[in-house]
Swiss-Prot record:
One GO location term (cellular component): cytosolic large ribosomal subunit
Listed HAMAP family: Ribosomal_bL12 (MF_00368)
Protein task: Forms part of the ribosomal stalk which helps the ribosome interact with GTP-bound translation factors. Is thus essential for accurate translation.
Subunit details: Homodimer. Part of the ribosomal stalk of the 50S ribosomal subunit. Forms a multimeric L10(L12)X complex, where L10 forms an elongated spine to which 2 to 4 L12 dimers bind in a sequential fashion. Binds GTP-bound translation factors.
Annotated InterPro entries: Ribosomal_bL12 (IPR000206), Ribosomal_bL12_C (IPR013823), Ribosomal_bL12_C/ClpS-like (IPR014719), Ribosomal_bL12_oligo (IPR008932), Ribosomal_bL12_oligo_N_sf (IPR036235)
Native organism taxonomy: Bacteria, Pseudomonadati, Pseudomonadota, Betaproteobacteria, Nitrosomonadales
Protein name per UniProt: Large ribosomal subunit protein bL12
UniProt xrefs under Pfam families: Ribosomal_L12 (PF00542), Ribosomal_L12_N (PF16320)
Length: 126
């Protein structure tokens, strides 16, 4: 039962889409594999090359690391930046180190970090 690869390819080329779908399902069952996983693995190297430059971080988190001496001013900045109420902002400041704002653009994160620094706090961007 020696069938040449060319004969197999010709048979597959002459199949309808429905017949190909059934063939794939039967092959998945017989060999215990998934055609979807193979397609993802085959596409991964091509996507990996294109995704390498896109790995630059686009979302940043501003972390309040230390309050400093002017706690009231820091609470005011946290309230202005986050829209939190007085109690929530105070709890955030008291619980430092904590994230002030997450998932924001780099420019926004730098502006918030600057405002916190001007209020006497120490903040970092992650």
């Amino acid at each position: 039962m020696a069938i040449a690869k060319a004969e197999i390819l010709d048979a597959i080329a002459n199949m309808t889409v429905l017949e190909l779908s059934q063939l794939i399902k039967e092959m998945e069952e017989k060999f215990g594999v998934s055609a979807a996983a193979a397609a993802v693995v085959a596409a991964a190297p091509a996507a990996g090359a294109a995704a390498a430059p896109a790995e630059e971080q686009t979302e940043f988190t501003v972390m309040l690391t230390a309050v400093g001496e002017s706690k009231v001013n820091v609470i005011k900045v946290v309230r202005a930046v986050t829209g939190l109420g007085l109690k929530e902002a105070k709890d955030l400041v008291d619980g430092a180190p904590k994230p002030v704002k997450e998932g924001i653009a780099k420019a926004d994160a730098e502006a918030i970090q600057k405002q916190l620094a001007e209020a006497g706090a120490t903040a970092e961007i992650k």
